[in-house]
Amino acid sequence: MGRNSGFTFKQFHVEHDRCAMKVGTDGILLGAWAPVAETRRVLDIGTGSGLVALMLAQRSRSDCIIDAVDLDMNAATQARENVAASPWETRINIMEGAIQDYQATPYDLIVSNPPYFGAGQSLRDPARALARHTGSLDSRDLLAACDRLLTPVGQVALVLPTAMADEILCISADYDLHGVCYTAVINRAGKEANRVLLLLGRGLNRCEQGEIVIHSAGGAYSDRYIQLTHPFYLKM
């Protein structure tokens, strides 16, 4: 396949024309931020094109295995192709199906860039609507899956709209998951945060607060964003 489409990173390429949700800043932030250095088993819920799984494979130990699940057949197929073309084909497994039905040995780290609009909203593209509609994976479904599939010392890393992050924090204790790190994502200096990178863990924790500003007031990428994404972006 030629590389006249999709998104080329330093060590891999992602085609996403058959995926409802395209490569975007949310996924790139999650893949660059999630604490994967010492993990051996990772689960990516709603992998889409496989972007986050590929980023985590680049950042993790050589013996780390990453399982990635997506409900959409076309996305799962394209994710498999992206993985097959990458340096980590033997370490990433792509599976199609609902996470509510997924069974596996517990994981050290679970990551997700989950759907985030409710029943009152819609999208014209049915596949995109499925990928972004919380009717197929609501907050409690996500937390229940994480509770069931996480080791006793495992962590969950999510990228979420601010309102959804606050909702998750309000109910996560019901699933023995508590805030470890809450990093507000601000698109441009001086604006309010509209996304959150959220890390959850077992047991009560002191939740570390922080922020990442993507663009300075003048529009340039911030030093922090460059530091996070430099291993991936071709021109960083």
From Swiss-Prot:
SUPFAM superfamilies: S-adenosyl-L-methionine-dependent methyltransferases (SSF53335). Keywords: Cytoplasm, Methyltransferase, S-adenosyl-L-methionine, Transferase, tRNA processing. It comes from the Bacteria. One of its GO terms (biological process) is methylation. One of its GO terms (cellular component) is cytoplasm. It is found in: Cytoplasm. Its main location: cytoplasm. It catalyses: adenosine(37) in tRNA1(Val) + S-adenosyl-L-methionine = N(6)-methyladenosine(37) in tRNA1(Val) + S-adenosyl-L-homocysteine + H(+). It comes from Aeromonas salmonicida (strain A449). Coiled coil: none annotated. It is an enzyme of class 2 (transferase). InterPro entries: DNA_methylase_N6_adenine_CS, SAM-dependent_MTases_sf, Small_mtfrase_dom, tRNA_Adenine-N(6)_MTase, tRNA_adenine-N6_MeTrfase. This is tRNA1(Val) (adenine(37)-N6)-methyltransferase. The keyword Metal-binding does not apply. Specifically methylates the adenine in position 37 of tRNA(1)(Val) (anticodon cmo5UAC). GO terms for molecular function: nucleic acid binding; tRNA (adenine-N6)-methyltransferase activity. Pfam families: MTS. CDD domains: AdoMet_MTases. Its EC number is 2.1.1.223. Belongs to the methyltransferase superfamily. tRNA (adenine-N(6)-)-methyltransferase family.
